[in-house]
């Protein structure tokens, strides 16, 4: 019951400037109905938040999420466990910290224990020491920014049909190692991924098409060849 309480109560939704910019770009490329919704966030934020919360990928752009990934109890089917353990994968929103996420989980655990008549002392919520973690990366500059505009030009040169907007990357990447030395860290992949291709990332038979690969290489060639424009 504690696990269900935590998983069912993610953080409060918050629209960052980056998310607003993403939705603004979507508005310009959507049908009339979605254009009206995304162009009037001052009115439709509650509706948009509800829609985004219903999808795992977009929910993590909006707020801190908790996904139950492991349960551990008895080592045998006929043995009562002296203790049980659960692990959550937590995606911390850019406007919160790891401590915020842990504190929320602890508070929810206490609430459920008290509601169930169980002493909160029987439940411990802590960060798994064996798993490295980092704070959410800062949002890189994107408004009237030379580096972001350069990336935009490179993308448009290879993918003229594509829209371009900042995006909240909700998974951990090695790019976080550069945050200490540079504020312009953009988590961008120059290859075109369909929903099907994204589902294959880190999965069995992960792959991309040959044409997708060739076009993606063209982006990186253009990106490196014109870096002098930033000097």
Annotate each predicted stretch with a short phrase.
Residues 4, 11-75, 82, 94, ...:
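An extended, acidic, His-containing surface patch that forms the Zn2+-binding/catalytic region
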Residues 1:
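Basic phosphate/pyrophosphate-binding loop/patch that engages nucleotide-derived ligands
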């Amino acid at each position: 019951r504690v696990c269900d309480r935590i998983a069912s109560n993610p953080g409060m939704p918050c629209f960052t400037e980056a998310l607003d910019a993403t939705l603004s770009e979507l508005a310009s490329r959507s049908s009339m109905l979605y254009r009206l919704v995304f162009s009037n966030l001052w009115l439709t934020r509650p509706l948009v938040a509800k829609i985004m919360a219903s999808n795992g990928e977009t929910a993590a752009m909006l707020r801190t999420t908790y996904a139950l990934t492991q349960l551990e109890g008895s080592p045998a089917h006929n043995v009562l466990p002296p203790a049980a353990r659960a692990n959550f994968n937590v995606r911390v929103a850019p406007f919160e910290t790891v401590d915020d996420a842990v504190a929320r989980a602890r508070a929810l655990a206490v609430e459920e224990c008290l509601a169930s008549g169980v002493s909160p002392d029987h439940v411990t919520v802590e960060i798994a020491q064996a798993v490295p973690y980092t704070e959410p990366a800062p949002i890189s500059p994107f408004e009237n920014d030379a580096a972001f505009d350069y990336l935009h030009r490179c993308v448009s040169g290879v993918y003229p049909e594509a829209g371009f907007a900042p995006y909240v990357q909700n998974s951990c990447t090695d790019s976080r190692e550069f945050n200490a030395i540079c504020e312009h860290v953009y988590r961008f992949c120059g290859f075109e991924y369909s929903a099907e291709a994204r589902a294959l990332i880190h999965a069995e038979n992960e792959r991309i098409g040959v044409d997708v690969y060739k076009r993606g290489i063209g982006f990186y060639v253009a990106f490196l060849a014109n870096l002098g424009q930033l000097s």
